[in-house]
């Protein structure tokens, strides 16, 4: 099994990169987000690899971090999500944004990924809600929201407030952190309008 490739970029395709390792070139399939972060041909590259072995083929999937690779595997534990859809999700959302979306039960955020319909998005946020924090890698906003929300799912006001802040130009991480802080500082039970005000107050500090 191949766990990591270290070499130079030989060629970048639409959905893959060719990695030259001491004269042997490996095809690693990557998300569009990962491909956009790569350098130019001839530059050094390090990719974390997930190896798929099938009866008639061997396929490599490449990632910029071990965390992204873990998410790739976790996403595929949900029915209806294969390698192609998992890569599409990781191209649409960073691991941190994905963790936030699951913590908030934010189905529309996940459904933005090509190939992810409402039913698959629902399965993802439902089945992964108790698994996602282990893959955030730090005490991020997803964990903060989970702590404030307890074991329940995010209420409509919470989801609406996060969505409103992102519409104002804040990143999902910033919005989720702000709403988590708002809930902690007296916003529990508040409607979306109040949560938005409290969230903006947190962001202005």
Curated annotation (Swiss-Prot):
Intrachain disulfide bonds: none
Spans annotated as Domain II: 65-143
Pfam families: HHH_5, RuvA_C, RuvA_N
SUPFAM superfamilies, A to Z: DNA helicase RuvA subunit, C-terminal domain (SSF46929), Nucleic acid-binding proteins (SSF50249), RuvA domain 2-like (SSF47781)
One annotated Gene Ontology cellular component of this protein: Holliday junction resolvase complex
GO biological process: DNA recombination; DNA repair
Gene Ontology molecular function terms on file: ATP binding; four-way junction DNA binding; four-way junction helicase activity
UniProt keyword annotations, A-Z: Cytoplasm, DNA damage, DNA recombination, DNA repair, DNA-binding
Sequence similarity: Belongs to the RuvA family.
Domain notes: Has three domains with a flexible linker between the domains II and III and assumes an 'L' shape. Domain III is highly mobile and contacts RuvB.
Record's subunit section: Homotetramer. Forms an RuvA(8)-RuvB(12)-Holliday junction (HJ) complex. HJ DNA is sandwiched between 2 RuvA tetramers; dsDNA enters through RuvA and exits via RuvB. An RuvB hexamer assembles on each DNA strand where it exits the tetramer. Each RuvB hexamer is contacted by two RuvA subunits (via domain III) on 2 adjacent RuvB subunits; this complex drives branch migration. In the full resolvosome a probable DNA-RuvA(4)-RuvB(12)-RuvC(2) complex forms which resolves the HJ.
UniProt protein name: Holliday junction branch migration complex subunit RuvA
Taxonomic source organism: Allorhizobium ampelinum (strain ATCC BAA-846 / DSM 112012 / S4)
The encoding gene: ruvA
């Amino acid at each position: 099994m191949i766990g990591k490739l270290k070499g130079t970029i030989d060629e970048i395709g639409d959905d893959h990169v060719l990695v030259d390792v001491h004269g042997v070139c490996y095809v690693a399939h990557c998300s569009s987000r990962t491909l956009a972060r790569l350098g130019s041909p001839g530059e050094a590259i390090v990719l974390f690899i997930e190896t798929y072995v099938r009866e008639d083929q061997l396929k490599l999937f490449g990632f910029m971090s071990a965390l992204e690779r873990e998410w790739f595997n976790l996403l595929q534990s949900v029915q209806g999500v294969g390698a192609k859809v998992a890569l599409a999700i990781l191209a649409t959302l960073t691991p941190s944004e994905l963790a936030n979306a699951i913590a908030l039960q934010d189905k529309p955020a996940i459904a933005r990924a090509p190939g992810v319909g409402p039913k698959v998005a629902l399965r993802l946020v439902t089945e992964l809600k108790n698994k996602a924090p282990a893959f955030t890698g730090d005490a991020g906003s997803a964990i903060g929201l989970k702590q404030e929300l307890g074991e329940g799912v995010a209420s409509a006001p919470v989801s609406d407030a996060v969505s409103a802040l992102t519409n104002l130009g804040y990143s999902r991480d910033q919005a989720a952190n702000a709403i988590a802080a708002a809930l902690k500082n007296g916003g529990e039970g508040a409607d979306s309008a109040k949560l938005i005000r409290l969230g903006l107050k947190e962001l202005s500090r």
